[in-house]
């Protein structure tokens, strides 16, 4: 089934996110004068991003070329793929294409942020063909941990540009999770010019354990639990949640959810028929105490670190709703990212101290939602791309995926290891990497978008590490004298009662600096403040080897 529209001239592929990181997916494909955005995801902040809520890609390049943007094409409903859509649509008018569930989740996100902008939504499936001036766009079903996941295929005269989205191959999953192998094979046979593909598990050998085997071993583990069972998993892992529901029904246990992040997405998916839930299986969390402990399963859910934080609070008897009790069993059904490993280890220790039993999370009862090495090679062999762009992973994962591509026959010079903002362009003969566009991170803190940058983060780190030191002086400029102060305030720097001599020395230093400034023919407030910063910083560092943030405050009467 050829969907080539016309003879094309120019092709460009530009990652704005989702490279060098496992999140924030956003890839721009340009064919002649038309631009297509593939996914628009967010990333949860790293530890050093103090006070930041989420991170989205910098879309300045898209804004500057917004009249060419033909649409935002979404592969699935996870935050890594759709989390930035509402922020993009605040700045750009563009139609949104996605599966039924994905579109429903985007609409809910728009509603949650109270964005009332009229948006053109197009619900697509594996049979859909979207026709544009220069190209046609089709879709194929993929398998992920959320239903209705899609790959995107942009048909050009050079062959298709295929974006797999996040995927794995698991023939035990059916219905809304089943991959469309037949359509993938057709696309590969028609000719794939460039493949843009998920690298998250490119370092993991073999295949994922099939989900039906996972569920079988989960059943065996859960059946041995005599008391209360708490399962911790991400709200976005619909496959795992369905498995727990299935097992609970078989074990005659009621299920209750603990975690706000699940409520909206779960309820949307439930109403749309994506969950199979036996009657009377679910109970409200406030009714759990009405049942014997061996008749309930609590699913503690959330995004990123929320499930682990909830367990930690329960172990420390600090949770508002429920605490860990002697004899509870815990199953942690989440993948530990690098920055979560220490937190998870500490939490497991807290749980054991509180009297809980930990169900080991081994390969028998855990599978990734991303394809391992053999699954990635399977996709490469099906698509047989001329050019290959590994994405959706840390740089070492992209390199591992590049090696797999070379093993399956892709020429090494036609494999591109890219960073954010890199432009891969077709010059009529070869794809080359010779340009860069503006890219980076936009940090979102509360309702502020982009108003937290590196300088603000640096200040937050400084405050967190060495505290703050404030010197307040009130001046009488007319009579050139100090009217009140200096008064010293510090927070997070030193314990005042044990540092009185140092603070008195700082007061005298401030007094001397100000008095010298008042003797000048022209009083330069900015110069006085800078002298206060420099000299007080030197004094404090010599005494404490710390550099607090110094804020001089000068007022006049």
Swiss-Prot record:
Zn(2+) binds at residues 76, 78, 144, 166. It holds the Pfam family RNase_J_b_CASP. Its main location: cytoplasm. One of its GO terms (molecular function) is 5'-3' RNA exonuclease activity. The keyword Cytoplasm applies. GO terms for cellular component: cytoplasm. InterPro entries: Metallo-B-lactamas, RibonucZ/Hydroxyglut_hydro, RMMBL, RNase_J, RNase_J_2, RNase_J_b_CASP, RNase_J_bac, RNase_J_C. GO terms for biological process: rRNA processing. Its cofactor is Zn(2+). Its EC number is 3.1.-.-. It is found in: Cytoplasm. Keywords: Cytoplasm, Endonuclease, Exonuclease, Hydrolase, Metal-binding, Nuclease, RNA-binding, rRNA processing, Zinc. Binds up to 2 Zn(2+) ions per subunit. It is not clear if Zn(2+) or Mg(2+) is physiologically important. Substrate binds at residues 366-370. An RNase that has 5'-3' exonuclease and possibly endoonuclease activity. Involved in maturation of rRNA and in some organisms also mRNA maturation and/or decay. NCBIfam families: MG423 (TIGR00649). HAMAP family: RNase_J_bact (MF_01491). Belongs to the metallo-beta-lactamase superfamily. RNA-metabolizing metallo-beta-lactamase-like family. Bacterial RNase J subfamily. Homodimer, may be a subunit of the RNA degradosome. This is Ribonuclease J 2.
């Amino acid at each position: 089934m050829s969907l080539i529209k016309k003879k094309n001239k120019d092709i460009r592929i530009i990652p704005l996110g989702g490279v060098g990181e496992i999140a924030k997916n956003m890839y721009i494909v340009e064919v002649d004068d038309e631009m297509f955005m593939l996914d628009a995801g967010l990333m949860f902040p790293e530890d050093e991003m103090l006070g930041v809520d989420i991170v989205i890609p910098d879309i300045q390049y898209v804004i500057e070329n917004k009249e060419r943007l033909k649409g935002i094409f979404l592969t699935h409903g996870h935050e890594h793929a759709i989390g930035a859509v509402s922020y993009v649509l605040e700045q750009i008018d563009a139609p949104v294409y996605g599966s039924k569930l994905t579109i429903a989740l985007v609409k809910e996100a728009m509603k949650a942020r109270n964005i009332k902008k009229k948006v053109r939504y197009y619900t697509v499936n594996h049979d859909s063909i979207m026709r544009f001036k220069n190209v046609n766009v089709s879709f194929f079903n993929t398998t992920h941990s959320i239903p209705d996941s899609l790959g995107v295929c942009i048909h050009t005269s050079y062959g298709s540009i295929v974006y797999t989205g996040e995927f794995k191959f698991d023939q035990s999953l059916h219905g809304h999770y089943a991959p469309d192998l037949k359509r993938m094979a057709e696309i590969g046979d028609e000719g794939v010019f460039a493949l843009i593909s998920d690298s998250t598990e490119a370092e993991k050998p073999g295949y994922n354990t099939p989900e039906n085997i996972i569920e079988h071993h989960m059943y065996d583990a859960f059946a041995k639990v005599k008391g209360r069972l708490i399962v911790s998993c991400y709200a976005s892992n619909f496959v795992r949640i369905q498995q727990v529901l299935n097992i609970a029904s078989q074990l005659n246990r009621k299920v209750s959810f603990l975690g706000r992040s699940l409520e909206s997405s779960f309820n949307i998916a439930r109403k749309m028929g994506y969950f199979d839930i036996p009657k009377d299986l679910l109970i409200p969390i406030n009714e759990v105490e009405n049942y014997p402990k061996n008749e309930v399963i609590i699913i503690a859910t959330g995004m990123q670190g929320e499930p682990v934080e909830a367990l930690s609070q329960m172990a420390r008897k600090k949770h508002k709703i429920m605490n860990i009790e002697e004899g509870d069993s815990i199953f942690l059904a989440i993948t530990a990212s690098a920055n979560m490993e220490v937190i998870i280890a500490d939490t497991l220790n807290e749980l054991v101290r509180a009297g809980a039993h930990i169900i080991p999370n081994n390969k028998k009862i855990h599978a990734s939602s991303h394809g391992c090495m053999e699954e990635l090679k399977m996709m490469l062999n099906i698509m047989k791309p001329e050019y290959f762009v590994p994405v959706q992973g840390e740089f070492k994962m992209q390199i591992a995926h590049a090696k797999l591509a070379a093993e399956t026959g892709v020429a090494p010079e036609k494999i591109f290891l890219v960073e954010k903002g890199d432009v891969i362009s077709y010059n009529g003969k070869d794809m080359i990497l010779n340009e860069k566009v503006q890219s980076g991170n936009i940090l979102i803190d509360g309702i502020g978008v982009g108003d937290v940058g590196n300088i603000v983060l640096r200040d937050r780190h400084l405050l967190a590490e060495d505290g703050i030191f404030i010197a307040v002086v009130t001046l009488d400029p007319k009579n050139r004298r100090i009217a009140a102060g200096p008064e010293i305030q510090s927070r997070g720097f030193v314990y005042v009662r044990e540092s009185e001599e140092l603070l008195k020395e700082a007061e005298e230093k401030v007094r001397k600096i100000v008095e010298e400034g008042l003797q000048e023919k022209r009083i330069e407030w900015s110069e006085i403040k800078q002298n206060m910063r420099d000299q007080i910083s030197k004094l404090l560092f010599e005494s404490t080897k710390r550099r607090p943030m110094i804020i001089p405050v000068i007022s006049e009467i």
